[in-house]
Amino acid sequence: MSVKGRIVTDMIRFFTAQKMLGPKIQDGTLRKNLVEAPWHCPEEYINLPIHMRQFEMELLTPKEEDCGEVILQLHGGGYIAKIRNAYRDFAVRYSRIKGYRVLSVDYRVAPEHPYPAAFQDALEAYRWLLYSGFTGDRIILAGDSAGGGLVLALAMYLRDQGMPLPQKLIMMSPWTDLTASGPSYQENYEKDPLFGNTRESMIYSGEYLGGHSPKEPYISPLFGDFSKLPPMLFQVGGIEMLLSDSISAE
């Protein structure tokens, strides 16, 4: 790891320990007390709020260069955190790559809405894109952490149901194993600056399961069937507790 990387890692670890993020994540304090300033959409974009029956979405559209493809973004947060402004910024960055539209899904979260709420919302968002005229080969699924797990679970469900598959899957540090059984959960326990050194982090929270087995493939897609899925990109850091969730999937 570079000197710059070590400095950033140490800063994250210090902040996490000082703020006791593990307990605050688990009891909902962090989610309830985190207030953000209003997000300002760049002038070259239109950010359209879309009100679904049980959740909200936002469609970011470039005013000029529209490539005709769309990225369905599923945010992270351990299935207990709502969408934040950082993901709106991510949407802008995604769009600027090629002129993509970006549909960001503010899916329902636990503990108020355990599984399958978030999964159902992701599926409904994908169906909304199909009904809106996008073919599967013009849809890209992207997500990080819990959102990355949702991306993979959704793709497996679409294949199982014979529905149009997306063009590709992009997953950053996806949470694909809610049993936390991979070796990196132990090997990187002292190294991970965000989730390490606490058994009270979101990784060990069962609030999302809602009485279901953590080995169900649409909950932990690591235990699912990877055949006949679209091309997949996994990105994960070597010191993350979620490292095994990507390596084992490959």
Model-derived features with residue positions:
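Alpha/beta-hydrolase superfamily serine-hydrolase fold, recognizing
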Residues: H51-E250
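A glycine/proline-hinged amphipathic helix-loop "lid/cap" segment
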Residues: M1-E65
